[in-house]
């Protein structure tokens, strides 16, 4: 006997929740966290004490759970609804149907009643009095009849109770009770109870209870209970229980329980349990349990359990378990388990397990396991396992395992394993393994392994392995391996291996190997190997090898090899080799080899070789060879060879050779050869050769040769040759030749030749020739020739020739010729000729000729001729002729002629002729003629003629004539003529003539000065009898 305890009856929803939202356990303690000891249903747990009282708070839904719990009597509070009590906690002892719950209270009530009655006394609470009284005014369960339960008395005769219109037939010890219009027929020891209009037929030892309008037929030792309007038919030993409007048919020793409106048909030794509105059909030895509205069909020895609204069809020896709303169909020997809303179809000897909302279809000998919302379809001998929301389809003898949300489709003898959210499709004999969120598609006999989030597609006989987030696509016979986040696409019989984050695309018969983050694309029968972060693209029959971070693109029949960080692009039949960080691009049949950090681009049939850090670009049929750090660019049929750090650019049919650190640029049909550190630029059909550190620039059809450290710039059809350290610049059709350290600049059609250290600048159609250390500058159409250390500057159409150390400067159309160490400067249209060490300066249209060591200065339109060591200075339009060591100075329009060691000075329009060692000084427009060693000085407009060693001085407008050793001095308007050793001095308006010598003529003694005759400005002389002597004091 249990002390201070009572039993309560209540109902919960299908999920064991009460009206307050508290979830009751299937067994054990339940407690209200918000307990308040006040009357009312809220803030506590409630129940119907002893199952007796008002049934209004109880749920009459077909899926309601009937709960029996044990409660401490001291914690109970009676509430308004009759028979209902409130309590803070309880212990669940039984959960089942209404019938099982009432039977539980009926069978265990005796363990509590005595204790309750014993404790009742004065002052006990109201609830205790209710417990003692048992309050039977509104019974929910039948009263307990102690006499019948204990079996102390046995009926000894048949009891028949019927209303009008009933027919009762019972054998010994039967009890028949029927409403009006009923018919009951019972065998020995049977009990039949029916409402009006019912029909009951029972064998011996049977019990039939039915509502009105029911039909019950039972074999011996059977038990049937049915609501109104039900039909029950059971063979011996059967137990049928059904709600109103139900139909139950059972074989021997079967047990059928169904809610109202149900239909149950069972073979012998079967057990069927169904909610209302259900249909169950089972062969012998089967066990079917279904919720309301379910349909169950089972072969012999099968077990079916389903929630409400389910449909189950099973062959013999099958087991099916399904949640509500599920559909299960299985052949013999199958085992199906599914959550609510699932659909399972299985062949013989199959096992299916699925969560709610799943669809499973399996052939014989298959095993399917799926989470809720999954779809699985398998042929015979297959094993499928999938998480919720998955779809699995398998051929015979296949094995599929997938996480939730996955889709798997497999041919026969395939194996698939996938994480959640994956998609796998495989033909027969394939093996697929993928992480969650992956997609795998495989042909026959293929093997696929992938990390989560991967996509794999393979033809037959393929093997694919990929890290998470990868994409692999392969035709038959391919082998693909990729790290996470990779993409691989392969034709048949290809092999691809890639690190994580790589992309590989290959035609049939190809082999691709790539580090992480690489991209490889290859046509059929190609072999690609790249380091991480590389990009490779290859045509058919190509072989590509690259270090990490490289980019390779090749057409068919190509071979590419590159170090890390390289870029290679090749057309068909090419061979490319590059060090790390290189870039190579080649058309068909090319051969490229580069060091690390290089860039090579080649047309078809080309060969490129470069050291590290080089850049090569070539058209077809080209050959490029470069040292490290070089740049080479060539059009078709070119041959380029450069040292390290060089830059070469060539047009078609060109040949370029350069030392390290050089720069070469050439048009087609060009030949460039350069030492290290040189720069060469040439248009088509050019030939450039330079030493190290040189710079050459040429137009088409030019030829440039330069020593080291030279600079050459030429227009088309030019020829330039320069020693080391030279600079040459020429327009078209020019020819320049310079020694080392020279500078040459020429216009078109020019020819320049210079020794080392020279500087030459020429306009078009000029010819310049200079010794070493010279400087020549000429306008167009000039010819300059200078010795070493000379300086020549000429206007257009000029000709300059100078010895070494000379300086020549001329205007246009001038001719200058000078010995070494001379300085010549002329205006336009002048002719200057000087010996060595001379200095000539002339205006335009002048002609200067000087011996060595001379100095000539002339204005325009002058003509100067001087012996060596002479000095000539004249105004414009003058003519000066001087002997050696002479000095001539004249105004414009003067004519000076002097012997050696003479000095002539003339004003403008003067004419001076002097013998050697003479000195002449003339006023403007004077004419002087002197013998050797004479000294002449004239006023304006005078004419002086002197013998040797004479001194003549004249005033304006005078005429003086003297023999040798004479001295003549004249005033204005005078005429003086003297002979040997004579001295004449005249004033104004004078005429003095002494010419005496009567040895044989010339006498002429004439004198005239002032008004009356001689006197004027003294002295005049003659003597020796010919008189006129008045010589001044010595």
UniProtKB/Swiss-Prot annotation:
Region (Octapeptide periodicity): 162-993
Transmembrane residue ranges: none
Biased composition (Polar residues): 261-286, 311-334, 357-382, 407-430, 453-480, 580-592
Cellular component terms per the entry's GO annotation: cell outer membrane
Region (Disordered): 260-287, 311-342, 356-383, 407-438, 452-480, 570-597
Domain of life where this protein originates: Bacteria
Subcellular location: Cell outer membrane
PROSITE patterns noted in UniProt: ICE_NUCLEATION
InterPro entries: Ice_nucleatn (IPR000258)
Keywords: Cell outer membrane, Ice nucleation, Membrane, Repeat
Single annotated GO MF: ice binding
Any matching Pfam family: Ice_nucleation
Other information: A structural model is suggested in which the ice nucleation protein displays a symmetry related to that of ice.
UniProt similarity note: Belongs to the bacterial ice nucleation protein family.
Entries under PANTHER family matching the protein: KERATIN-ASSOCIATED PROTEIN 21-1-RELATED (PTHR31294:SF8), PTHR31294
Domain comment, as recorded: Contains imperfect repeats of a consensus octapeptide A-G-Y-G-S-T-X-T; further on a 16-residue and a regional 48-residue periodicity is superimposed.
Function comment: Ice nucleation proteins enable bacteria to nucleate crystallization in supercooled water.
Protein name, UniProt field: Ice nucleation protein InaU
Organism whose genome encodes this protein: Pantoea ananas
Name of the gene encoding the protein in the UniProt record: inaU
